[in-house]
Amino acid sequence: MAHSAPKAQKRETFSGRRAFILAAIGSAVGLGNIWRFPYTTYENGGGAFIIPYLIALLTAGIPLLFLDYAIGHRHRGGAPLSYRRFSPHFEVFGWWQMMVNVIIGLYYAVVLGWAASYTYFSFTGAWGDKPIDFFIGKFLKMGDIKNGISFEFVGMVTAPLIAMWIVALGVLSMGVQKGIAKVSSVLMPVLVVMFMVLVIYSLFLPGAAKGLDALFTPDWSKLSNPSVWIAAYGQIFFSLSIGFGIMVTYASYLKKESDLTGSGLVVGFANSSFEVLAGIGVFAALGFIATAQGQEVSEVAKGGIGLAFFAFPTIINKAPFGEVLGMLFFGSLTFAALTSFISVIEVIISAIQDKIRISRGKVTFIVGVPMMLVSVILFGTTTGLPMLDVFDKFVNYFGIVAVAFASLIAIVANEKLGLLGNHLNETSSFKVGFFWRLCIVLTSGVLAFMLFSEGAKVFSEGYEGYPNWFVNTFGWGMSISLLVVACFLSRLKWKSETKLTIDETKGE
């Protein structure tokens, strides 16, 4: 009898709505909010960009957030188990999402290590008067990828990389409430306070108004350019942690009576509010350095790694109390990256734990230690930066966008949206209906355009001048391998104690 009707293990839960919201915001607010949004806004019409950005948030970001919440909460499992309980044919999407998180986790840790190192460097001034030369030549000791992959390890990179892995795995081993929720409940308020102080400080720097003018002056002509709208949808999609298993996993830890849509609205608008705050702080600081150097903002404005590790050290060198500015900026970057990194690894831990039914401590070790070693081998060397660049590009477009597009098409084609909508409406304050379903369908089209247009561009032009063998192996090869491994994992049997179906009226 015990084998015919196995009793499922009791799933961990967040203590309440506040704990979940802070953890979800912690996942969503990451590197992209601080170093991607400001420059994306500046490049795509300034103040005018806010219009497509808000439309993207309301028609894609929040609807997809609701969808992820419904899948995870209704089916009470990590991504693979939730999709398996949704439909046996959908299980592969969950494993595909898990594999995307494996790749992201491998390289996200190294950027987290960089940010932590630069928090310390803010006080020592290690980068001197030439931050670019220091970052490329002394910190990364960057080699030429055209000469092949290097296995020459860089101590300044590997030591903080390993340290960040140990911190994250320590948090994850403590569980959902005692680990993830507690850390998020501390780091997120601290992050907001630190960044508010940074913004206020930046606004009082000479030339701050010049930077804000550059950021917010609208170029309305940009709104007729389709690439601007795609940039808006891309920013929302990549910054909200939607479509690749994180929010499915976190929602599965909610108690059965939870306000899903209300929480989703809070998370969605909190994430966007932080992005706007980041834009103000970053461009006020860029206005200062442009004024100090007698340049235009366009000459100093950068995004991504260039903003964080080239532009900001220069700003810190020239700003009054620059050490404080550096601590606030790189400390914020570290905290934001850490909570996002934890959420990425949790997707993998949850998936494996559901599959083989062993303790959280054991599965954290089984997942974490091999990933840490691979992370060090790939990104702790002199060719770590080009490896990171290619991994990030391909896993975003041909991992995240690809699996989101495929899973949405499957859900819509199999007429499952109504089922998820009903689940959302059972416990939520904000009800969904036809408009929500329409947004999901239309978002599928946007994702298809993003996927195929970017695929055609990279296929015909290559990527950033990297050698074909490198892009084909670690770009296209990696992307294809994610789906291949996902198909293999979906064929493996589940542990007999794993309950693969749910009560359609009550859930697990």
UniProtKB/Swiss-Prot annotation:
PROSITE patterns: NA_NEUROTRAN_SYMP_1, NA_NEUROTRAN_SYMP_3. It is found in: Cell membrane. GO terms for molecular function: symporter activity. GO terms for cellular component: plasma membrane. GO terms for biological process: sodium ion transmembrane transport. The chain crosses the membrane at residues 19-39, 47-67, 92-112, 153-173, 186-206, 228-248, 272-292, 325-345, 365-385, 394-414, 432-452, 469-489. It holds the Pfam family SNF. Its main location: membrane. The keyword Membrane applies. It is a multi-pass membrane protein. InterPro entries: Na/ntran_symport, SNS_sf. Keywords: Cell membrane, Membrane, Symport, Transmembrane, Transmembrane helix, Transport. The keyword Transmembrane applies. Putative sodium-dependent transporter. Belongs to the sodium:neurotransmitter symporter (SNF) (TC 2.A.22) family. This is Uncharacterized sodium-dependent transporter HI_0736. It comes from Haemophilus influenzae (strain ATCC 51907 / DSM 11121 / KW20 / Rd). The lineage of its organism: Bacteria, Pseudomonadati, Pseudomonadota, Gammaproteobacteria, Pasteurellales.
